Amino acid sequence: EADEPLWLYKGDNIERAPTTADHPILPSIIDDVKLDPNRRYA
């Protein structure tokens, strides 16, 4: 669990589209991060 948020924490990693494709659930989380950085766990 802490592994995913780790790279998510880095806004620069958002450019990694391939990584997002591997994790279909990540795209949703990334959207939340952009909307509310505080709610990255939402």
Swiss-Prot record:
Main location as per UniProt: secreted
Subcellular location: Secreted
Taxonomic superkingdom: Eukaryota
Alphabetized UniProt keyword annotations: Antibiotic, Antimicrobial, Fungicide, Immunity, Innate immunity, Secreted
GO CC annotations, alphabetized: extracellular space
GO biological process: defense response to fungus; defense response to Gram-positive bacterium; innate immune response; killing of cells of another organism
Family: Belongs to the lebocin family.
Function: Antimicrobial protein. Has antibacterial activity against the Gram-positive bacteria M.luteus (MIC=22.7 uM) and L.monocytogenes (MIC=90.9 uM). Lacks antibacterial activity against the Gram-positive bacteria B.circulans, S.aureus, and S.lutea, and the Gram-negative bacteria E.coli D31, E.coli ATCC 25922, and S.typhimurium. Has antifungal activity against A.niger (MIC=90.9 uM) and T.harzianum (MIC=90.9 uM), but lacks antifungal activity against S.cerevisiae, P.pastoris, Z.marxianus, C.albicans, C.fructus, and F.oxysporum.
Protein name listed in UniProt: Lebocin-like anionic peptide 1
Gene source species: Galleria mellonella (Greater wax moth)
